[in-house]
Amino acid sequence: MKKIKRPDLEKIKNIKRPNSFTFILYMCRLVFRGLILLAAVYLYFAHRDLLVSFVRDDFLRTFDWRHVIWLVLMFGMIIHILPAKFITMGSRKSSLNTYTEPTAHYDSDELYRFVQIMNVKAWKVMLIWLCFNAVFAVLYLFGVIGNAEMLLLSFLYFVSDMICILIFCPFQSLIMKNRCCVNCRIFDWGHFMIYTPLLFIKSFFSWSLFFTACIVLIRWEVIYASHPERFWHGSNTTLQCENCKDRICQIKQPLKEMYRHISKNIQDYLK
């Protein structure tokens, strides 16, 4: 198998740019979410009753550590509804105040084609996600798994969401094919995906999170349908690489470049 040539290695190294505030913030969020998942795993094996207490009827009777977790999770969605200035442009691009129209006139037909292609890909992702989670839903409804397992699954998705943003996203690589998260058509679908397992648990904790996530999703889709020009780099120069201030692709892009070269070398070797 061929080795990656030195010029290619230099190209991979040169992808890295100075860390931005957004990148550092999201790395901290990844660590924080990882700690929450570890705590949930610990509770699952050591004190499962405490984990299940999130979805019990006494959740609203007293204020304790469970409500702090709930507030943190809810806050994570509220900042996407507003949206807050410190989150990535991947979410904020839906707002009018982040839209920058190009000086040269863009092709409306090309924008329309972009919308059509991205919509088809987006609903493929939705279909795959619903089918995948339908497996857990059936297991839950037949009593094979319970509330604790569904909560743990949701916390796993909670971490996976940030991994998709910073490190690797299978939906981006295999289906959407967008060049980065800032340009992602389904960026604000994340919370809906995170809390999908909670739909099947009848409690204030689970349903408040799931249906708030639905509001985030619906808001995103309404804006996308009304103002698609905000979501395409050809009609919104804010989304172009040279204007990016987030730089949250610092890990993902070098990995993509490395994977591309390895794949090419494997193909050349098999010829």
Residue ranges of model-derived segments:
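Cytosolic-side membrane-entry/anchor segment at the start of a transmembrane helix
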Residues: K2-F45, S94-E110, K177-N183
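Membrane-helix boundary/juxtamembrane motif in polytopic membrane proteins
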Residues: I167-F192
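Long, highly hydrophobic alpha-helical transmembrane signal-anchor segments
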Residues: P18-L73, V120-L139
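Charge-rich cytosolic interhelical loops and cytosolic tails of multi-pass membrane proteins
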Residues: I79-A122, N265
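Juxtamembrane/interface segments at transmembrane-helix termini
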Residues: L82-S95, I167-L174, W220-T238
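Hydrophobic alpha-helical membrane-embedded segments
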Residues: R33-A46, D58-K93, L141-V144, L151, ...
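Short, highly charged, low-complexity non-transmembrane loops/tails of multi-pass membrane proteins
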Residues: S226-K271
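Hydrophobic alpha-helical transmembrane segments in multi-pass integral membrane proteins
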Residues: W189-S206
